[in-house]
Amino acid sequence: AHVADSILGGRVTSHMEARYGRVRMRFVDRTPAELGIRGRGFGLAQDDLFSELASQAGLESAWVHRADVRQEFSAPMDLGPVRVAPFLVGRVTAWDDDFSRLSPEQTESVRIWGGLGVRASTRVQRVFDGVRSMLLDLDRLRWTIEPSVTAMYSEADIDQREVPEFDSSVESLATGATVELGLRNVFQTHRGGPGRSRSVDVLRLDTRLVTGSGDLYRESVVPRFIGWRPELSQAGDHVRQTAAWRVSDSVAMTAEGVYDLDEDLLARSAFGVSVTHSPLLRTYLEYRRLDASENELLELGWQYRLSPTYSVLVRPTWDLKTDDFRAVNLTVTRRFPDVN
């Protein structure tokens, strides 16, 4: 259940989320070799069973009742050209199990988590009326710069490693201090010609630098910061760079890279090209690399609109490391245009 409201004359926004459920873990009784994946990313040999790893870690498959309530207050305000929004978050989670097999020293079944932080951002722009290029399809240029910062400190009375992770958005809550510095550059132009002119984001460059306190628990080989809910972030000092270039109305290119500052390596990278051949057909090519699992994948996709309501997407994936097909996916989508 979600409840949102404004209080104190609209100066403070309140958002409450509550959930209750009966959850359990189900373990895969197969090996990485049988699933066609590399076990290195899971700390396994190719012939080790996933179920044995879970059992050795103290995880069980019994049903558990769980209740979780999250309350957030935010007070956005304008300080000159800067938008500032301090926020306060509290969360209570209860289970009908203390998970003593996973963590013998942990005897509590109710966790209290709290955090406070601030978000701030501003925007500056400049218009270049004299920019014209038939080659790059540019007609004037607006350059917008959006610097931002998000900082948060949180604590909990139960460490996230002492409870099994049924749901990463409930059990896996980060504690400690985290700061994200962001800089977004957006270049806009006019495209479409007389009578059809429209504003287009021709190039977007988004740079994020994330750093945290030394006591943050790192649970993922690829760090990630989630600005709208920092407690769900994957800890680790890193730089994330994304880029999107709309070459023309039919061709677009995207790229992403996550550089792990703790390990001094490129943890994840991706590059893609999308081509819209007609209103009915779109194709794309995407390359993805993940350092931890030594994966290098190449995916080619065809999306065809069969009718106004049906479309089909075919996505074969090639493993560049093994020089063999990894998977072939087929997705059929049915739209309901009359349903709002």
Predicted regions and their residues:
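Outer-membrane beta-barrel proteins and related beta-barrel translocases across Gram-negative bacteria
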Residues: 1-340
